[in-house]
Amino acid sequence: MHAERLLFMTGTALENKVEEMISLIRILQPRIASQIQGMVFMSAAPQFRKAVAPVYYRRKREDVLTELPDLIESKEWCSLSHNEELAYEHAVLSKNYAEARRVSWNVDDLRDSSKASRLLELVEEAESEDRKVIVFSFFLDTIRKVTMLLGKRCTNPINGAVTPQRRQEIIDEFDKAPAGTVLVAQIQSGGTGLNIQSASVVVLCEPQFKPSIENQAISRAYRMGQTRNVLVYRLLCEDTVDEKIMSTLESKQAIFDAFADKSVAAAESQEIDDRTFGNIIKEEIDRINAKYGNTK
């Protein structure tokens, strides 16, 4: 197919690494792509910004949607109960990465879950303020447990097995539901391509490995048509992988923000890869072993 003009429009020109953006530019302007091919380190950011200026123009949401209400984000730090701590330490020492990430949700009885307790409080607060809630998690088992915990407050959950048509039906039901109603969604499925402005509270059950995944999930509620301030709560547990994941992501996000606001891609990945998370688990193993006097 031939065309006189070619335009790419995306909210995520770069998600993991600078080469992704170079690949897009190569289609638009091969000459510019060849110039920036080697500019993949932070020291080259100024040159990169200047080189891509003819083909890359970034407009942030707040630049064009000045009427949007405030977005208020909060970290909800929870202290582990004894049973939570035992379950978490078992997951870490057995190098069960998924279970370690599901800290607080991986207990048998959610009455022992500090995150579940805080979630219930947030839902009650939302109802008292005439708000509705979206709860996101990466894990299907967490989705199942949250749905059981909240019972009749929930609509049907959204996950990868739900068809696009059925997803929209669930959202339509949620839009008509009273304050205090909760939509529970798997973040990969419900976090993109959906408009859920009837909710003004977003709860993230665990930190994700990519900031872009969380940002897109939040944007289901915080988008054109939203009339209320949107409250975002991140449920986190102290002295766990939650702390280390957040610390790592925040440092990467700061680098990205410093450059992306000037229409330049940060030359470092924002994503926590398997190797990085493996190092986080190793640090936790060492900490737990030291706690019990095991130096092996």
Model-identified regions with their sequence ranges:
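Conserved P-loop NTPase motor "coupling/switch" region that bridges the ATPase
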Residues: 1-67, 179, 226-229
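Interdomain linker/hinge connecting the two RecA-like lobes of the SF2 helicase core
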Residues: 34, 40-131, 140-141, 148, ...
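Conserved catalytic network of the ASCE P-loop NTPase/AAA+ motor domain
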Residues: 1-4, 16, 70, 125-128, ...
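SF2 helicase motor core recognition
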Residues: 16-18, 143-145, 182-206, 210-227
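Short beta-strand segments
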Residues: 52, 56, 77-79, 134-139, ...
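Conserved helicase ATPase core of P-loop NTP-dependent helicases/translocases
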Residues: 134-136, 145, 152-190
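Conserved segment of the helicase C-terminal RecA-like domain
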Residues: 222-246
